[in-house]
A protein has these predicted regions:
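Nucleic-acid endo/exonuclease domains
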Residues: 1-145
């Protein structure tokens, strides 16, 4: 199935090592175990990084392969893909929608160029989001100590 960038895996390993231990067994990304797979009507969708027990997905979008809207106009034909930027955006949007509708998982998109410029802040934002979702999950559970 799909390709992945080395940069994405560096980010995902860094997040994985900083996230709470009790979430790690429900974490999926290419180099750890596999990408998270959802099948709908015999169409397979792979997701870059998923923590399924807090319903969080991170998609690491390469600026070229996913036609970063800060770099492409909707009618641009994207190098290497030979597709219109708007078609790539529609496909990516549908993939995110499928995950939400079929698994109730929300998606955070990280653009490669943003990551390159701002690694530390993006990583902190992601870890904070993971902790926030984990706290919500724990506070809404029926288990009491």
């Amino acid at each position: 199935f799909g390709g992945f960038s080395k940069s994405s895996q560096k980010l995902f390993w860094s997040i994985y090592h900083k996230m709470p231990e009790h979430l790690k067994d429900k974490c999926y990304f290419k180099e750890l175990n596999k990408e998270f797979l959802v099948s709908v009507n015999n169409i397979f969708y792979l997701y870059d990084f998923v923590i399924s027990n807090i319903n969080l997905c991170i998609e690491f979008n390469g600026d070229i392969w996913h036609a970063n809207p800060n770099k492409y106009k909707k009618d641009d034909t994207v190098l290497f893909t030979n597709k219109l930027a708007s078609d790539i955006w529609d496909k990516d949007e549908n993939k995110i929608k499928i995950l939400k509708e079929h698994r109730n998982i929300d998606t955070l998109v990280i653009w490669e160029s943003d990551w390159t410029k701002n690694k530390h802040d993006i990583e902190i934002d992601i870890i904070n989001k993971i902790c926030e979702l984990d706290t919500k999950r724990i506070s809404t559970s029926t288990i009491s100590c």
